[in-house]
Amino acid sequence: MATFKVVISNPKNGIARQIEISGDAAEKLIGKRIGDEIPVKELGINLSEIFGQEIPEDAKLKIKGGTDKDGFPMRPDVHGPRRVRILLSRGPGFRPKEKGERRKKTVRGNTISPEIVQINAVLVF
């Protein structure tokens, strides 16, 4: 049984809240990719209670990224739920110290699997 920490950001006011999802709701997230939108009703989350303000019921969560159990970040350009070492020059998982620097880094693919611990999502109205 998978359990995820989901960080939900509200772009209208800049507030982010972290919730924990487990059980059937977590099973619905497995197999989704970065960029996919999931209706909040499908997950059984009451966002109005979490954010303390009125959120429309037809709101969706757009998956923006996440990290696995060992802290490796998800990258949208690596397909599948696998972990892989790739040569990076910029983007999620790498901050160059010098201009033009490239380095091999371990990152996680763009698909949610049971090894993922944290999922970053943004509200879409």
From Swiss-Prot:
Keywords recorded for this protein, A-Z: Ribonucleoprotein, Ribosomal protein
A Gene Ontology cellular-component term: ribonucleoprotein complex
Any one GO molecular function term: structural constituent of ribosome
GO biological process: translation
Pfam family, one: Ribosomal_S6e
Record keyword Ribosomal protein present: yes
InterPro entries with a match to the protein in the record: Ribosomal_eS6, Ribosomal_eS6_arc
Presence of the UniProt keyword Ribonucleoprotein in the record: yes
NCBIfam families: PRK04290.1-2, PRK04290.1-3
Alphabetical list of PANTHER family matching this protein: 40S RIBOSOMAL PROTEIN S6
Family: Belongs to the eukaryotic ribosomal protein eS6 family.
Name of the protein described by the UniProt record: Small ribosomal subunit protein eS6
UniProt organism field: Thermococcus gammatolerans (strain DSM 15229 / JCM 11827 / EJ3)
Gene name of the encoded protein: rps6e
